[in-house]
C-alpha cells in the first residue's frame, strides 16, 4: 500500500476545488466525511482523505492518498509518474500524456499489463529463429539451400496458428494463451537440445505456431477489453513490448559467437519467463466475450 500526503494552504476557491471529486487519472466519488472513493482508475485499492483546518478566508488542508496499483509486472515503472499525477491535479478531465486516452479500470489495467508481459515472450520467440538459424546451420553443416528451406518450413507455424485461434473462441482466451506460452518455452528448450537439423526445424515449427497463436489472441483480447478510444494506443504499446522481446534476442546474439554450439544458449532464455505463465494464468480473467458466451450457455 502506497501513501502520499500533501499539505495545501488554500483560499475558499482552492478549498472548493480540492474538495470536489477528481476526474483525471482517477475518477472519484464523494464518500462523505472528507473521503473520496474510487470509481475508475488503475488501482486495486484507492482512498483520498481531506483533513481541513479553517480560518476566515484561509484553509490548511492535509490531503492523504492511500492506494495500490493494479499494474502487474510493470508497476515499478509507474510509481513515480502516478505519484506525480496524483500530486498535480488536472481539472480539465484529461489524463497525463503517458496514460491511455480513456480511463482504464482495475480489470482493464491488469489484463493489459499482463498482455504486455506476454508480448515480451512473443517477441523473443518470433525473433530467435531468424537470428540463430544460420549458427545452427553451421553446426549441423547444412548448405544455403537447406537454410532457405528451413526458413520456409518454420513459417508454416503461422498458418497452423489459425486453428488455435479458433480453439480460443471455443475454449477461452486465457486457457489457449497458457498453453501457447507453455509450448513455446518448452519447444524453445528442445530446439536448444536438438541433435539434428530435422529435429531443430520441427521444434521451431512448434515455436512459431505458439508465437503466432500468442500474437493473434493477445490482439483480440486487448481489443475486447480496452475502451474504443484506447485500442489504437493499446496495440501500439503491445507492439513496443513485442519489439523489446525481439530486441532481447539481438542483445544476446553475441553469445552465439562464443563457440560453435553456443547459439543453443539463446533458446534457453525463455525458461526465465516460466513465472510469467503462472502469473498470467493466475491474474488474467477470461475475456468478457467468452464470459458472456458461457453465461448464455449455462
Language-model-detected regions and their locations in the chain:
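Extracytoplasmic
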Residues: 111-144
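Helix-breaking motifs and short loop linkers at transmembrane-helix boundaries and internal kinks
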Residues: 141, 172, 193-198, 210, ...
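Central cavity-lining transmembrane alpha-helices of secondary-active solute carriers
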Residues: 151-166, 215, 219
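Structural signature of the two symmetry-related core transmembrane helices
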Residues: 175-190
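Helix-loop junctions at membrane interfaces in 12-TM secondary transporters
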Residues: 192-203, 259-260
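Cytoplasmic helix-loop-helix junction between adjacent transmembrane helices
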Residues: 203-240
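Glycine-rich segments within core transmembrane alpha-helices of 12-TM secondary carriers
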Residues: 230-258, 273
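Symmetry-related core transmembrane helices of the 12-TM Major Facilitator Superfamily/SLC fold
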Residues: 263-282
Amino acid at each position: 500500500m502506497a501513501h502520499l500526503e500533501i499539505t495545501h494552504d488554500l483560499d475558499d476557491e482552492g478549498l472548493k476545488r480540492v474538495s470536489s471529486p477528481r476526474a483525471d487519472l482517477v475518477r472519484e466519488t464523494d464518500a462523505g466525511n472528507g473521503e473520496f472513493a474510487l470509481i475508475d482508475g488503475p488501482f486495486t485499492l484507492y482512498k483520498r482523505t481531506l483533513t481541513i483546518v479553517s480560518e476566515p478566508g484561509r484553509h490548511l488542508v492535509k490531503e492523504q492518498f492511500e492506494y495500490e496499483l493494479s499494474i502487474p509486472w510493470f508497476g515499478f515503472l509507474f510509481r513515480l509518474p502516478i505519484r506525480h499525477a496524483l500530486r498535480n491535479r488536472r481539472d480539465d478531465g484529461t489524463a497525463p500524456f503517458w496514460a491511455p486516452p480513456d480511463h482504464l479500470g482495475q480489470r482493464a489495467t491488469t489484463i493489459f499489463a499482463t498482455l504486455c508481459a506476454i508480448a515480451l515472450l512473443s517477441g523473443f520467440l518470433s525473433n530467435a529463429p531468424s537470428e540463430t538459424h544460420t549458427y545452427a546451420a553451421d553446426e549441423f553443416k547444412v548448405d544455403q539451400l537447406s537454410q532457405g528451406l528451413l526458413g520456409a518450413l518454420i513459417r508454416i507455424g503461422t498458418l497452423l496458428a489459425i486453428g488455435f485461434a479458433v480453439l480460443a473462441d471455443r475454449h477461452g482466451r486465457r486457457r489457449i494463451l497458457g498453453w501457447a506460452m507453455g509450448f513455446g518455452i518448452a519447444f524453445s528448450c528442445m530446439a536448444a537440445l536438438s541433435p539434428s537439423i530435422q529435429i531443430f526445424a520441427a521444434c521451431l515449427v512448434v515455436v512459431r505456431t505458439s508465437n503466432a497463436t500468442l500474437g493473434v489472441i493477445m490482439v483480440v483480447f486487448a481489443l475486447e477489453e480496452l475502451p474504443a478510444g484506447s485500442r489504437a494506443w493499446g496495440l501500439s504499446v503491445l507492439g513496443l513490448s513485442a519489439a523489446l522481446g525481439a530486441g532481447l534476442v539481438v542483445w544476446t546474439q553475441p553469445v552465439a559467437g562464443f563457440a560453435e554450439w553456443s547459439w543453443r544458449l539463446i533458446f534457453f532464455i525463455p525458461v526465465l519467463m516460466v513465472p510469467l505463465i503462472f502469473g498470467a494464468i493466475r491474474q488474467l480473467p477470461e475475456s468478457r466475450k467468452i464470459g458472456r458466451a458461457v453465461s448464455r450457455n449455462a
